[in-house]
Amino acid sequence: MNKQSWLLNLSLLKTHPAFRAVFLARFISIVSLGLLGVAVPVQIQIMTHSTWQVGLSVTLTGGAMFVGLMVGGVLADRYERKKVILLARGTCGIGFIGLCLNALLPEPSLLAIYLLGLWDGFFASLGVTALLAATPALVGRENLMQAGAITMLTVRLGSVISPMIGGLLLATGGVAWNYGLAAAGTFITLLPLLSLPALPPPPQPREHPLKSLLAGFRFLLASPLVGGIALLGGLLTMASAVRVLYPALADNWQMSAAQIGFLYAAIPLGAAIGALTSGKLAHSVRPGLLMLLSTLGAFLAIGLFGLMPMWILGVVCLALFGWLSAVSSLLQYTMLQTQTPEAMLGRINGLWTAQNVTGDAIGAALLGGLGAMMTPVASASASGFGLLIIGVLLLLVLVELRRFRQTPPQVTASDS
């Protein structure tokens, strides 16, 4: 059979027990983090009535994640990766307990929320980097595209479920329940991760960590193909920072606390559909052009989002953004793995993830600032259409990425 299915092949979960353990742990972790992601902005909005303060919390956490990714890349290449993953997860859980205790105080501390956001952002990113570095050893380099799509599906499905649960918890029990369940879920993820095999770092000459990072930066800047992919990823992540406007837009649409969860769930739902129907993406002849066009469509969806007269139509726009961004992100991931030398894969993956975090932090800060000067509707639309203009310029400038062609892999009877 030579016809490739549109649907994602989930066979890796059956054939690779270690990857199955990571799948389970990641799903539980994403559900836990989703509860946190709903609670923090809503709590800050209630305490301060300021979109700028909400944006600041996201920016601070994003900055801590950037530093953590840089440090984590070095640790993952020097120390046993399973230990790094377990240490990072356990430390994050401690931070979530701190948020829960703070929320139970008669007057919760805004400073404590910011500081614990820095703590959790830093240590969470250590685990992310170690998992990225360990994935080829867990599934094999030939299965990276499939593993990436399954991972995205895991993340997105968890992100669909958790905001809805988080919204219901906010409406019934308050933010302390969100933080407490997030902490419990994070510690539960340690159980499947304990079953992972030892994941030693690859043998390589010892060099100063900064020198190693600089080599990765130089490669990224010198390669118009890989550098263009990283730039698109950062801009796409900037667009997703529109979530800092959700609480204010919810007031504009007169949404209930439970309905706010649908805003947070829309993008992950669209992305889950994109990952589930990604079976043919690896066989695209012109992945660079498809990546550029899907990114432009995602920016347009964000521009239209804030203009919708009803919140349900806004949810549809967010879901469309999620689907298009999933297509672009999967193509980014696959092309980075195939176009980056093996010796550079760890650093480039870390830098790619770090610039995505940076894009999110910058986007959150810009949207928070716009929200202080403009209406939430105008802020959302300005960000989407502004990124669309930049995207059109990149479509013209990134010639090598736009014209890149690949030979689709052959599909044999054993693959079907």
From Swiss-Prot:
Pfam families: MFS_3 (PF05977)
Record localization: Cell inner membrane
Cytoplasmic side of membrane: 1-21, 77-83, 131-156, 200-218, 278-287, 337-356, 400-416
One of the record's GO cellular component terms: plasma membrane
Origin superkingdom: Bacteria
GO molecular function: enterobactin transmembrane transporter activity
Keyword Iron (UniProt): no
Membrane topology type: Multi-pass membrane protein
Keyword terms, alphabetized: Cell inner membrane, Cell membrane, Membrane, Transmembrane, Transmembrane helix, Transport
Topological domains, Periplasmic: 43-55, 105-109, 178, 240-256, 308-313, 378
PANTHER family named among the record's database cross-references: ENTEROBACTIN EXPORTER ENTS (PTHR23513:SF9), INTEGRAL MEMBRANE EFFLUX PROTEIN-RELATED (PTHR23513)
UniProt family annotation: Belongs to the major facilitator superfamily. EntS (TC 2.A.1.38) family.
Protein's UniProt name: Enterobactin exporter EntS
Organism encoding this protein: Escherichia coli O127:H6 (strain E2348/69 / EPEC)
